Regions:
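Non-catalytic DNA-recognition/assembly elements of restriction-modification systems
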Residues: 8-40, 149, 153, 157, ...
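Sequence-specific dsDNA recognition surfaces
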Residues: 9-13, 30-75
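Positions in alpha-helical segments
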Residues: 12-15, 101-104, 115, 145-149, ...
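A structural connector/turn signal
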Residues: 67-68, 137, 149
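A short beta-sheet element
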Residues: 69-71, 78-131, 135, 143-144
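Alpha-helical coiled-coil heptad-repeat register
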Residues: 168-171, 175-178, 182, 189
């Protein structure tokens, strides 16, 4: 699949990003999606690391009971699993709830599309850099300082929405093909 190039590019100032379209901005994550620290007052829609599928951010139901305080999140927030960040557990919240355990919860500003930001954070380069900054050997964790300092490419909001919608559509098509292949494999057994 080939896509047309943008007419003009500029250096992003970030080695792993390379060039970006001329009209895009590059800003640190902490300025486009600040950290949420609001503690949950009641247990409502708890989400733990085990509820997030690696590399997709899909919410997985479990019967687990969760203890301890959580961070309140809203629809549109992003939950970044800070424990073992190489697992890429990054969830875009489609409803409000409580992040239980090792999460950095960030809230995109008004000029940032949360789905676009989630896709951007799920880039292999992004995850590898964050993973290289972890502390702790048995249970490596990503700090907010490292995550918040990450450069984030930002096209204008309408373009962010179009890119996120395109990626969501294409990912859904791939999911259908994978499910069909799994069904065919089961038939062959």
């Amino acid at each position: 699949m080939s896509f047309p190039r943008y007419p003009e590019y500029k250096p992003s100032g970030v080695e792993w990003l390379g060039e970006v379209p001329e009209h895009w901005e590059v800003n640190r994550l902490k300025y486009v999606a600040p950290l949420v620290t609001e503690r949950a007052e009641t247990r409502s829609n708890p989400v733990a690391l085990e509820n997030i599928e690696s590399w997709t951010g899909t919410l997985l139901p479990t019967d687990s009971q969760f203890e301890g305080e959580g961070t309140q999140f809203r629809t549109g927030d992003i939950l970044f699993g800070k424990l073992r960040p190489y697992l890429a557990k990054i969830h875009f919240a489609t409803r409000a709830g409580e992040a239980v355990g090792d999460f950095h919860v960030v809230r995109p500003t008004a000029d940032v599309d949360g789905r676009f930001l989630q896709h951007s954070m799920l880039r292999r380069e992004f995850i590898d850099i964050i993973d290289g900054t972890t502390f702790g050997s048995k249970m490596p964790r990503a700090s907010w300082e490292a995550l918040g300092a990450m450069p984030t490419p930002l096209p204008p909001l309408p373009e962010q929405r179009a890119i996120a919608a395109f990626l969501d559509r294409e990912t859904a098509k791939i999911d259908v093909l994978v499910a069909e292949q799994q069904r065919l494999i089961e038939l062959l057994k």
